[in-house]
Amino acid sequence: MESNAFSRIAEENMQGLYRLSFSILHTRHDAQDAVQQGLLRAWERRETARPEQIRAWLTRIVINECHNIQRKRMRVVLMGEMPEMAAPEDTYEAEAELRSAIDSLPEKLRVPLLLRYMERYSETEIAQTLGVPVTTVKNRLFRARCAVRAKFDEEVTFE
């Protein structure tokens, strides 16, 4: 892949990658680090990328970087230090409750939900990104929606 094409694709996906990273890591600094490190790794391996799956490939790399950062955090916590936590930015109560409900989901349910409804990935793209069958993605999305709905007295509409 040419450097101009890679730069364009990275630029087009950067905000979505950041939002996903932030939803996993909950701090701006770590989310920025994950995206930057992920794009650097992608740049180094850009020749191996298949153009038809570039978005899923980039997303998977950044998710892996988020996991690396989480592992580093765990080591810090085990050594007795507490990681810096971001203060909630949402000022509206409903948004804060929704974010809390989504954040409380296990990662295997939270990531597909965020990719589907925040980043507008198709179920097929999510399956490619996560390396699971489409039926698994559908099941996880269903379970995630049910879990979020259970946090509220009234039904939440995602679409």
Predicted features and spans:
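A short pre-motif secondary-structure segment
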Residues: P112-R116
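Arg/Lys-rich amphipathic alpha helix in sigma70-family domain 2
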Residues: R60-G80, T91, R143
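C-terminal flanking helix
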Residues: M14, Y18, L39, P106, ...
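Residues within helix-turn-helix
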Residues: H29, T124, T135
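A short, charge-rich alpha-helical start-of-domain segment used by transcription regulators
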Residues: M1-R19, Q32, S104, R110
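Acidic, proline/glycine-rich intrinsically disordered inter-domain spacer in sigma factors
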Residues: R73-D103
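Structural recognition of an alpha-helix C-terminal capping motif at a helix-to-coil junction
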Residues: R19, D33-L40, E44, E52-N64
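DNA-recognition helix of helix-turn-helix
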Residues: I63, L130-E154
